[in-house]
Amino acid sequence: MPIRILPSDLSSQISAGEIIERPASVVKEIIENSIDAGSKNINIIVENSGFQSIILKDDGCGIDKKDLLLAVCHHATSKINSLSDLDKLTTFGFRGEALASIRAVSRLTLISCTRFNDVAAKIYLEGFCSKNIILQPIAHPEGTTIIVDNLFYNIPVRLKFLKNKKLEFSKICEVVKKIALSHFYINFSLKHNNKLITQYNSINNRKNKINRLKDIFDTLDTSEFLEIKEKKYRMVLFGWISHPYNFKKIKNIQYCYVNNRYLYNNIFVNAVRAAYSKIEQKKNISFVLYLTIESFNIDINIHPTKNEIKFHNPDVVYTFIYEAVFSYLKKIKEKYYFNFSCKKQTQLNKEKEFYFYDSDPTFLTLISSIFFKKKQIFKNIKNKIKHNNFISKSTPLEKYESSIGRLLIIIHKYYGLIYHDNNFLLLSFPVAKGIVRKQKLKNNIQKENIIEYFLSNIKINLTSQEYLILFNKKEILSKFGFHLIFKKKYVILSSIPAFLKKCNFHIIISNFFAFLFLKKQVFISDIVDWFYINVFIELKNWTYIRGIEVLLEIEYYCPLLLINPPSKLLQKININAALCILKI
């Protein structure tokens, strides 16, 4: 058979099949057009699951009567003018294919009016045959009405594969639901066979956005969801995630949006699941998340229906979503277990009987406060309490005494007042935590157990001398988790130690490399000391619970340090001198 160009009506039907798969595809395309037109009210009326007719009415800006015929032609759009505009897209449509594809497989009526038109215009088309075009004036308010009749009337083969009308209508409902979830300021209504199915009222207050979830998911208990909002890496993440310690059975809801466009993306799902796995192993994870990202950092034009998207820096997006979700889950974890401990303590204090060590409120409270910490610390605590088989239930948390002594109070955010053997001591928590982290790093290097954090490759330009210094030190750097790829004139950094990921690692790495360039010879101890001074000592507010946690870590990781503690860690307070002055 010779090669020939297909007739225009046949080629249009074939290309339309990629975009218009079912009635729900029509609903999606025309709603997105209405949103691009700035509509505040969108009403959808469906007959016979969309096979008989689909009607959409909106109050958008409308289509000028001189552009009405052009609007139903292939590749006719007002969204882009040049190839560079694809990097600046803020609209749903841009290819100019939606109405042309719908026209190719249905009997289409398009009525529209702009604020500049005295009268509206109506156009009627059957398939892609230019002979059946009727254009006439008509009365109509500002906005657009689209009537799609007899869908797939000219493609009977397609109708054979779409026999389940209940399924097709459920697909339409799902499309409306997905779009309504990302456009809170628009009123949506859906009617089927003259019966109102859904009505989603507009929400103008950000605090009330969760009410849209209540409207869409009738049985959903929104109190089981946490609102999150994070801004970083020139991206914004907003939405709701299910409570990590929710023990009720809730519907599995997973919706993710990029620039208000719904899509199912593995980066979202994997990042959220990874964050939950650090807190609580849950099979049933629900979330509705909205990512706002600069349009030039994504590629929408990779799928006919635009249901897929490509990120130019997927690793950065994954890291951002993971860190944002994990930070909120971590706060909830700490709050949840602290409340659990307080309730348990109150309940136990009502009783004055004695019991075995494993019901000790000290043990329970400590376990809850350092939940999910190293198993070795748990064993250490348990061994300590095991020496006293019977302990009073009224033993409060503040009576817990470590080898250093009993922590009484936090002073000036960073220091702990400790009582030990009739002496008062002042402990620096930043120094203590730094020493613990330093010892952990030493242990991990000895065991070759450094955890790496993989980056999107970072290119580092170096002088020939700096290049040579790093090349000579690549083996010792690899022990710390720095993976360097040496090219001819530059170096690529692909991983760093995991303990740097929460820091501003770009500045830390720059300073660290500057330190290496000044050293002709460097040892493991030199690098450990550098991290101790520049990374491990953090000035942040300390709580009583975290203070006890650090005391336990010192006991476990640095027991020899307690024999002769450094002056920067622990200072004895001269109470006797003060008593002599105050003596009556």
Swiss-Prot record:
DNA damage as UniProt keyword: yes
GO molecular-function term, one example from the UniProt record: mismatched DNA binding
InterPro entries in UniProt: DNA_mismatch_repair_CS, DNA_mismatch_repair_MutL, DNA_mismatch_S5_2-like, HATPase_C_sf, MutL/Mlh/PMS, MutL/Mlh/Pms-like, MutL_C, MutL_C_dimsub
Gene3D superfamilies: 3.30.230.10, Histidine kinase-like ATPase, C-terminal domain (3.30.565.10), MutL, C-terminal domain, dimerisation subdomain (3.30.1540.20), MutL, C-terminal domain, regulatory subdomain (3.30.1370.100)
SUPFAM superfamilies noted in UniProt: ATPase domain of HSP90 chaperone/DNA topoisomerase II/histidine kinase, DNA mismatch repair protein MutL, Ribosomal protein S5 domain 2-like
Keyword DNA damage: yes
Keyword annotations from UniProtKB, A to Z: DNA damage, DNA repair
Domain of life: Bacteria
GO cellular component terms attached to this protein's record: mismatch repair complex
Pfam family, one: HATPase_c_3
BP term (GO), one: mismatch repair
Family statement: Belongs to the DNA mismatch repair MutL/HexB family.
PANTHER family: DNA MISMATCH REPAIR PROTEIN MLH, PMS, MUTL, DNA MISMATCH REPAIR PROTEIN MLH1
Biological function: This protein is involved in the repair of mismatches in DNA. It is required for dam-dependent methyl-directed DNA mismatch repair. May act as a 'molecular matchmaker', a protein that promotes the formation of a stable complex between two or more DNA-binding proteins in an ATP-dependent manner without itself being part of a final effector complex.
Name of this protein: DNA mismatch repair protein MutL
Organism (species): Buchnera aphidicola subsp. Acyrthosiphon pisum (strain 5A)
